[in-house]
């Protein structure tokens, strides 16, 4: 398959205008009943609307990179799901810094953000816009609706599969909301369509809801690797459960490491395989070269899904200084994103000659950072590119073709190993070691980087997660799970806004509910200490 499925988001955007264009935050319902009634009468529209749900991770509005945005009150490119998620997951950590002084962007490094932060508000709005979109599709594909809309018997099973996928996408989005914000507004397809004030759900209760949803839809999803590229299958359900269980102690106070082993094992043995090249997973044709490893990816195309967010942001923003933008398949660098020396130190050889995951640009760059606003301070990261695996340019030098892996098999290898080391049962350290060394053999090209059982410990796993998964939206969650995101046990350059790094209060492990949401909904209470 090509990216044909996700291209349908262009068509879906036009149809979804009546369904969803009025949603700018949670209290505005994205439903126009008359439009819904007409669109859902024709089953030929259903797949295009489903594509719009998947496209919620990629596109930002109805007409392209700018104009008619889904989210108001912020630059449209900045409102991108992936861009917002990356900034909230990576900028407060050792993996990424950014040189721009746009609004409150530097507050992520300083870790002194407030409930009035525009970037946090935009991500909150994006999450609940996506949830509202999913809710409407789920409502319209219930059995009674399918019957009243006259959907033919031959199409019912397909409609139910589409519905299960929409429920998965809603669960994934709620997972991100739970991880970032903790206690959030809670709306499902069973809630009334008319205006009302949603109740707030606790983090632990939301965890239980997502878990129930995933287990309920598991058998309704396509088998692992049986769906089109860009669409979710059973392995995605298992992977999200494994991720939740690995972090369950943070979310609920109760560890679930045995369950993390169970579900990561399901993914690992499901038929997905590690891609042959690490570097190719982040290039313009990764949808072709790396689909054996990508459980689910946000699809991007330089012609059909243009946005200033997503991987367009990740490629352009990481190019600056003496770097040649053309070598990354783009027409310009935005001179923003780099990394800290603390992250660089995870690699014993930063040249990439041994561990090929060490993808740094050092020419003209200082290893240490004195001024965040100076691009040449801090090594640049060359992981993301709009060049293909064969060296050709992507289809557009402004908007990139590179897909963003929301879930990939390597994470499950790391999840299994960590859960075993944390005391989960049903796995073995021998198998865990094999899974870790499989990643390292790909990275090194041979067995020279393999570790022994004596070297396999929790500290190593955190470092290996950094080496394997950096700039893919995992680091904040990982550091929180290890108790290192706040406090003084681990500091990195500009943690807490200090060049040498400093301790940060524990309440920063979740973000505040935006002030605008609190004002709009009297049922919401602010997270503690905000």
Q: What are these language model-derived features?
A:
Residues 23-100, 104, 184, 207, ...:
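An aromatic- and glycine-enriched ligand-binding surface/loop that stacks and positions planar moieties
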Residues 47, 55-61, 92-181, 197, ...:
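Conserved, well-structured interaction surfaces
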